[in-house]
Amino acid sequence: MHEEGGSLGAIDPGDLIMVMSNDRKDVITYVEATNEADENFGYESHGWPGDVIIYRKNGGSDTPVIHRAVLEVVANGSGWDVPGTSLVNVQEITLTLDYDCYNFHDGNYKLNLQSWEPEHAGFLTSGDNNNGGCMIDQPSANSYGEGIGLHDSMGNPVLPVKDDWVVGVASSEIPWVGSIKLLTT
């Protein structure tokens, strides 16, 4: 924690992040790590439940994004499964996560998906973007007007993160070391 308003485990500007290949590690999502019935219950990375992944927006050549994997949608026949939840073979996803939005509505709000119909299988992610991290990066999954989400360099909304768009999983961090690069660019 070296930035005002930062928190333990948070990735701050200037931190050097070690990246583990996603081929070496299965991504554990926030919903899996917070579900008491899931084998990954209690797992944390960078101060919060679930893994932080590095991905390319829509598989493009934009600067990669480093955000937490909130949940994964998996194709199942004609519907969708959400590992770490009771949602199996559903057509749309409605889910309120135990994910406090401290900087949104005075902290009296939970991250919410309302009747979301996935475009394809992949991860939904969230980071320290607008609304204090209480916005899904993928605009189609945001409900109640939390925000516009992320867009790629062509202006297209970011879609659920496919496995082959994932560059890696954030491993350990070394505070301040990356500041040298920030100062020289």
Language-model region placement:
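Extended, hydrophilic extramembrane loops/domains of integral membrane proteins
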Residues: N112-T184
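Low-complexity, serine/threonine/proline-enriched polar segments
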Residues: I93-L124
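Short amphipathic alpha-helical surface micro-motifs
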Residues: E36, G47-G50, N103-N108, A141-S153
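Feature for secretory/organellar precursors and membrane-associated catalytic proteins
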Residues: M1-N103
